């Protein structure tokens, strides 16, 4: 099989694992046995040509609430494990969908985007991102490789970003002080 076949099969497997993780972690709020079924179907755009200001965006995986879809973009600079093949990355993006469904009621353009004052800190988005990092890490605990607090490391070339997103960092934890 060629690279894209392996990548798509890996992405499919990782989305299945992420769905199972959320099905196990989040009980059905109505106790009707649905679990994470509310996030189905998982729509995925693979190797998508996404443009921002006319430039193609590469080296990323996203959940885009306004199209209710995951977008796996072509890689260019990231030459390690492709993002679709990294369970932590896929679980991280799935966590964004869960947050959109559970906290934002499936809003295509969540209210916090419209009311954001442009400052570099947005509490709700930061909470979404932090929870996504936690779930990206937690989903890796189900695999043979065990828990990977630096789940971005196999895929990401930027050591600074990997270190910043390392969920085992004590200095990044919020305290009561």
How would you name each of these model-derived features?
Residues 4, 8-91, 99-177:
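Zinc-dependent metallohydrolase catalytic domains
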């Amino acid at each position: 099989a060629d690279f894209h076949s392996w990548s798509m099969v890996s992405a499919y497997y990782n989305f299945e694992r992420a769905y199972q993780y959320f099905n196990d972690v989040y009980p059905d709020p109505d106790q009707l046995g649905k679990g994470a079924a509310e996030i189905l179907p998982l729509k995925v755009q693979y190797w998508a040509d996404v443009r921002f200001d006319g430039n193609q965006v590469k080296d990323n995986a996203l959940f885009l609430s306004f199209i209710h879809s995951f977008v796996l973009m072509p890689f260019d600079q990231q030459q390690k494990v492709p993002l679709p093949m990294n369970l932590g990355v896929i679980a991280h993006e799935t966590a964004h969908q869960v947050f959109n469904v559970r906290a934002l009621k499936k809003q295509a353009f969540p209210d916090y985007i419209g009311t954001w004052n442009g400052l570099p800190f947005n509490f709700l988005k930061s909470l979404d991102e932090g929870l996504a990092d936690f779930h990206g890490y937690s989903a890796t605990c189900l695999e043979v490789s065990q828990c990977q607090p630096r789940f971005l490391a196999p895929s990401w070339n930027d050591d600074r970003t990997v270190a910043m997103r390392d969920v085992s960092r004590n200095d990044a934890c919020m305290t009561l002080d």
